[in-house]
Amino acid sequence: MDFFTDQVKKKFSDKKPESSDPEPNHNKNKPGHTEPTTHKPGHGEPTTHKPVSNTDPTTHRPATNAELMASAKIVAEAAQAAARHESDKLDKAKVAGATADILDAASRYGKLDEKSGVGQYLEKAEQYLHKYETSHSHSSTGGTGSHGNVGGHGGGAGAPAAKKEDEKSGGGHGFGDYAKMAQGFMK
């Protein structure tokens, strides 16, 4: 046990090793990066996730690692809420934007061709999610009172129904089944 506590103390101690070298570049694989890609909100800066996608479809920039992790957290929380049948409490536009960011990163990471194969389906799904995000972003954040969630009745049934369809189709290892599931979730 002493070895473990010594290692923990060493890991979390405030002392930094004495070195005259400048701090190393931890982003060696990314040309032009001299700073780490993590972002810690400053004083007065909001800590909520803002999806990378925006309302202008011509402007598209890749998500940073921190933004992708935040997007993954949003999607995971949405999946948990859907499993608890609480999807009426979700900001579906925010979830759509986060999902689109993850799909974009997957297509870039996998170097998938946007014109053929799975890449074209990823691109279509990403475009659909961005369109959903832009068309529903102002309606889900605006509106106070009981009419803020129009059409939210039975919102949790979309994902389980899509999952049942997926099971009926023989396992559903195709991307089309995932797109159907995402579309069913957004209803």
From Swiss-Prot:
Biased composition (Gly residues): 142-158
Positions of modified residues (N-acetylmethionine): M1
Region of interest (Disordered), ranges: 1-66, 132-176
Keyword tags: Abscisic acid signaling pathway, Acetylation, Plant defense
GO CC, one annotated term: mitochondrion
Expressing tissues: Expressed in roots, leaves, flowers and siliques.
UniProt keyword Protein biosynthesis present: no
Gene ablation phenotype (knockout): No obvious phenotype under heat stress. Impaired resistance to avirulent bacteria P.syringae pv. tomato DC3000 (avrRpt2).
Any GO BP: response to bacterium
Induction notes from the record: Induced by P.syringae pv. tomato. Repressed by heat stress (42 degrees Celsius) but induced by low temperature (4 degrees Celsius). Slightly repressed by NaCl.
Leader sequence residues: none
Name the record gives this protein: Nodulin-related protein 1
Lineage: Eukaryota, Viridiplantae, Streptophyta, Embryophyta, Tracheophyta
Gene: NRP1
